[in-house]
């Protein structure tokens, strides 16, 4: 308990000092890994609140080690292994390919996200899984897929599900300082 209290005091003191740390990453590696993340097909009604493929692309490009192919430059839009033509992706100089579908889970309000991840040059499926969750969890599912892709390609465990806790000070300089604990996605 004393350790937790000590850590909280350090946070409060550091926030009251009004020092702001800003880290800006302006470039990644010299030769980012080319990857095609095909927009996931959706077999349900309406539009989903979160685009899983966009979440994955955002995660992978944010670390600077990957360069995603724009959907407008794709020769086809496969959503499962049987629709993948490796020559198309080699022509586009892509090393990896991620495809997927999103469906309503039978008899529930949940959705099932099925994805498949391929090594284009070796014509090999590296991973595939069905993840189930609510529509509100689609972003988290996208982060989980990003973790799998990142680890398979780099050998390093992905950290895209990481959440950060931080303290926000309100009413500073007044008689009544309020502090609020906030939780944020890594991105």
Language-model region placement:
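Sec/Tat signal peptide C-region and signal peptidase I cleavage site
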Residues: 15-19
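Short loop/turn segments that connect beta-strands within beta-propeller blades
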Residues: 120-121, 185-187
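Residue position within the beta-strands of beta-propeller blades
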Residues: 99, 164-169
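Bacterial N-terminal signal peptides
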Residues: 6-14
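Positively charged n-region of N-terminal signal peptides that target proteins for export
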Residues: 1-4
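Short beta-strand->alpha-helix linker/helix-N-cap micro-motif
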Residues: 24-87, 98, 104
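Structural motif
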Residues: 107-113, 172-182
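Amphipathic beta-strand/beta-sheet edge segments enriched in Tyr/Trp
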Residues: 21-22, 81-148
């Amino acid at each position: 308990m004393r350790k937790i209290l000590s850590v909280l005091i350090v946070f409060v003191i550091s926030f009251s000092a009004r020092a702001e740390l800003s880290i800006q990453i302006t470039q990644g590696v010299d030769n980012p890994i080319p990857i095609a993340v095909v927009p996931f097909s959706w077999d349900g009604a309406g539009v989903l609140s979160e685009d899983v493929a966009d979440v994955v692309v955002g995660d992978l490009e944010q670390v600077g080690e990957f360069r995603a192919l724009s959907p407008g430059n794709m020769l086809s839009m496969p959503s499962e292994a049987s629709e993948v033509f490796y020559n198309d992706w080699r022509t586009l100089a892509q090393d990896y390919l991620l495809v997927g579908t999103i469906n309503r889970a039978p008899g529930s309000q949940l959705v099932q996200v099925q994805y498949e991840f391929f090594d284009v040059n070796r014509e090999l499926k590296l991973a595939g899984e069905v993840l189930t969750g609510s529509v509100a969890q689609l972003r988290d599912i996208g982060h989980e897929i990003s973790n799998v892709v990142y680890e398979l390609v780099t050998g390093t465990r992905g950290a895209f599900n990481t959440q950060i806790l931080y303290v926000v000070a309100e009413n500073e300089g007044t008689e009544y300082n309020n502090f609020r604990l906030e939780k944020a996605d890594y991105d």
